[in-house]
Every structure is written in C-alpha cells, then in structure tokens.
C-alpha cells in the first residue's frame, strides 16, 4: 500500500520537525513548508493526502491558505493548527474549508495521531465510494450502448 503523504505548514521550525517526526514514525511520508506561498508551490508539484496548516503564517493567515487550497487542491484534507483556541477561529476555519481543527501545543500525541488517521480513513472511504459510483455509471452506460446496437 502506498504511503499517505502529509504536508505540515508552520513557521515554527521546531513544530514542523516535531510533527514530521511523529508522523514519519507512524509510516506517513511528510513534507514541510514554512509559509503559505511555499505550501502552494509544493501542492502544485506534489500530491498530498492531508495538510496541517498553522492559523498564523508569516505571509498569510492560515484561513486564507485554506481558501487557496480549496481552489487548487480541493480533495486534500485540511486541518487547521492553532495556539489560539477560540470558537470563532474554529467556525471561521470550517467555513473556509477546514476539515478539522487541532490546538497546540499538542499534549496528547496519541489523540493527535488518531485524528490524522481518522481523517485519512474518511478520505479513503470517500474515494472508494466515488470510484464505485463511476464504475456503476460506466457499466450502466455500456449496457445502454450495447442495447442500442442490438
């Protein structure tokens, strides 16, 4: 099975390294970015299953990056990471396309990893469902075309 790819976007190098290390130990392939623009460039040239996005980046707000990513890579799972755990931040992030919301510092490593795994599992289920629906449509269409040829 192919490794899931995760992009960690945070201007704090120690947080990027810590998250990358934790996720790599779980078997994920991890890439990092320090700015929103760097993240956008990486998503243009690489495929990622999931992005963890700090809410405050040096060149843009994490919620602005959410909107950009929603337009350029809509299928990527987007999780906002924040040291500012306020309800209005969570609501704003979800309204702009976040699939999840994690507060830092991350105290419960197992809980953090479980959230990542759950989001990736849901993504897999959604992809399988979509593939099944496409296959059903193609099969149905072939039968319709075959019936016309008879």
Residue ranges and their predicted role:
Residues 121-150:
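CheY-like receiver
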Residues 17-25:
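Charged docking surfaces used in two-component/phosphorelay signaling
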Residues 4, 35, 61-64, 85:
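Acidic catalytic/metal-coordinating carboxylates
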Residues 41, 63-75:
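Short amphipathic alpha-helix used as the core "switch/output" element in two-component signaling
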Residues 54:
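Active-site residues of response regulator receiver
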Residues 16, 58, 82:
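The feature encodes the CheY-like receiver
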């Amino acid at each position: 099975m192919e490794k899931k790819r995760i992009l960690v976007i945070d201007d704090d190098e120690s947080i990027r390294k810590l998250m990358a290390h934790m996720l790599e130990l779980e078997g994920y392939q991890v890439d990092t970015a320090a700015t929103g623009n760097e993240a956008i460039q990486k998503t243009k040239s690489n495929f990622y299953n999931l992005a963890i996005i700090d809410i405050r980046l040096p060149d843009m707000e994490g919620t602005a990056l959410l909107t950009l990513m929603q337009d350029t890579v809509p299928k990527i799972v987007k999780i906002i990471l924040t040291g500012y755990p306020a309800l209005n931040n969570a609501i704003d992030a979800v309204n702009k396309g976040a699939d999840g919301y994690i507060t830092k510092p991350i105290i419960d490593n197992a809980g953090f990893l479980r959230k990542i795994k759950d989001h990736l599992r849901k993504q897999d289920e959604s992809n399988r469902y979509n593939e099944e629906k496409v296959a059903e449509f193609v099969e149905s269409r072939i039968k319709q075309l075959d019936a016309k040829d008879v």
